[in-house]
Amino acid sequence: MKKQRAFLKWAGGKYSLVEDIQRHLPEARELVEPFVGAGSVFLNTDFERYLLADINPDLINFYNLLKTEPQAYIHEAKRWFVPENNRKEVYLDIRKQFNQSDDAMFRSLAFLYMNRFGFNGLCRYNKKGGFNVPFGSYKKPYFPEQELEFFAEKAQRATFICASYGETFARAQSDSVIYCDPPYAPLSTTANFTSYAGNGFTLDDQAALADIAEKTAKERGISVLISNHDTTHTRRLYRGAQLNVVKANRTISRNGAGRNKVDELLALFTPHLSSQA
């Protein structure tokens, strides 16, 4: 199976870790992802069914539209990727229209445009829910036609829902396995990116996720794999899991003083391990 890239640029995307995640995911008929993001794990695994969730309604509405109207969407989206749209004033006008519109097709077209023409592929909202990523000033933003087509075809096996991780866990079935890619625990007090979908993911949220993962394995017999930074705090949270350290290819900037690769944890909660805890 050829490795497949997501069509969205995405902070914390799992493309570089797909092989490690595949290796540690137990076999099941359904993969459940409460934090689907750009979908790299979905795109590079082969389960019969997928339940893919995110708290960002723009993302989920986009995925559902691409699933049901792929040709119409791709045809229209391609028309946005022209040199005259690669200007700051055009970008800011489209961003303004996006924040005022409730039309599903327009919002999905603008979402892809802003992902590719905006700064660094960020997805960020202000406290009022307005998308606020600045213009990216890229020479020629790439139109991901093949990636969109692949996603749309594979999406026929998937159900996309806008839901919290707790709601998504509740919908997992006995033949499911759950993979969680939450907003990562900070390496330092200044390193956290908390404006995704207008909500921060706190240390209390990290603890609650670890708790529900352990309970789901122990009480419902469903295995849960979580990825996160390898820190003293995350090791404490995942002490009831099998811990595997992987080397991430992505880099984390530390106060602008150079970039450092970081270790990541893959924590696997299984019914067997949880019953021994």
Swiss-Prot record:
Stretches that traverse the bilayer: none
Keywords: DNA replication, DNA-binding, Methyltransferase, S-adenosyl-L-methionine, Transferase
Taxonomy, superkingdom: Bacteria
Binding locations of S-adenosyl-L-methionine: W10, K14, D54, D181
Deletion phenotype: Essential, it cannot be deleted.
GO process terms (BP): DNA replication; DNA restriction-modification system; methylation; mismatch repair
Keyword Cytoplasm on entry: no
E.C. designation(s): 2.1.1.72
Reactions the enzyme catalyzes: a 2'-deoxyadenosine in DNA + S-adenosyl-L-methionine = an N(6)-methyl-2'-deoxyadenosine in DNA + S-adenosyl-L-homocysteine + H(+)
GO molecular function, one term: S-adenosyl-L-methionine binding
Signal sequence region: none
Cited function: May be involved in methyl-directed DNA mismatch repair, initiation of chromosome replication and gene expression.
Family recorded in the similarity comment: Belongs to the N(4)/N(6)-methyltransferase family.
Name of the protein this chain belongs to: DNA adenine methylase
Organism: Vibrio cholerae serotype O1 (strain ATCC 39541 / Classical Ogawa 395 / O395)
